[in-house]
Amino acid sequence: MVLCLFIGFLMAAGMMSAVPIYMDASLQRMLIKDMESYQLSTGDFPGIYSVSKTIGSGTGTAEQRALIDELPAQVRERVGAVRIPIGSSKTIVWDNLQYLINGTNKGVVASTRVKLAAMTDFSDHIVLKSGRMFCAGGVAEDGVYEVVASDTALKSLEAVLNGEYEVRSVDTGREPIRVRIVGVYEQSDPNDIYWSETADRYVNALITDYNCFTERLLGGGYAQLTDILVNYALSYQSMDMNDLPSVTAALSDDFTYYNELGYTFKMGIFKILEEYAVEAEKLTGILWTLQIPTMVMIAFYLFMVSRLNVEQEKNEIAIFKSRGSSSKQIFFLYAPESGIL
């Protein structure tokens, strides 16, 4: 009887614990499938958490550099409250108000719109197809700024590897600089979520050292910060589905927070997560409803086995009492067995 009672308790515990496990696994599979469909249809990595700011031309250098320090720190704090593991992150800064001077044509200066850009941890996520990486600090001994570019950028800019060019700002009050394209890069891994945004952003970009951009180019007044972007690639595949309500609440707060500060916040899958929070509640209710008949049957089973066990033990309890055992002694005699069950 004790063995039967133990089996009943074991079945009840198994049924109760199976519901959240099954629900979590089901929602996880559904979410990953929908995320993959989202990526195929939009071309964007589903877990991208993106905050950007476009800076007006009248913004002073000190304010630009302060923003470079403040925005990544603000985003780091906010994204930490979202209970999704972080896969990768980077900060991108650029000046898209520059022109690359390609030469002259019949006495007319030939120029192409170019974007001077820099990003954190860039060298860890690329391989060089040709040439070399820009020098430490980004400025050669002869004072020329060293940059690297993609094949697409070279074609777009009509530039060549090891070519040296003059770059002029749209703002005529800024001094021109000279840049040397010392390397041609490509992504080290096509599936690296560091490159989660579309490649269109780098079609006409020359990449330089991050500190060189923020300290030398901005500090020296040769460039201006026109845009800053902080990207976090969140590993949605590892998200605990039990955290879904808190995740959607945190993201909803982030939309309000960034909007009040004048930043642009993008989380393409926010609507999907909101829908899944509702679906999770519905699925939980359905699963528990389906479990009720089984749980009632197990409850009756435990009740009947317990009654039979009590009837069986009555004679033994009577014998113990006849031998002078107190109720307290009898209770402690059966307590270990009940505790184990």
Where are each of the predicted segments found?
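Membrane transport/envelope proteins' first extracytoplasmic loop
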Residues: 1-298
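Interfacial "coupling" helices/loops that link adjacent transmembrane helices in transporter permeases
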Residues: 26, 300-340
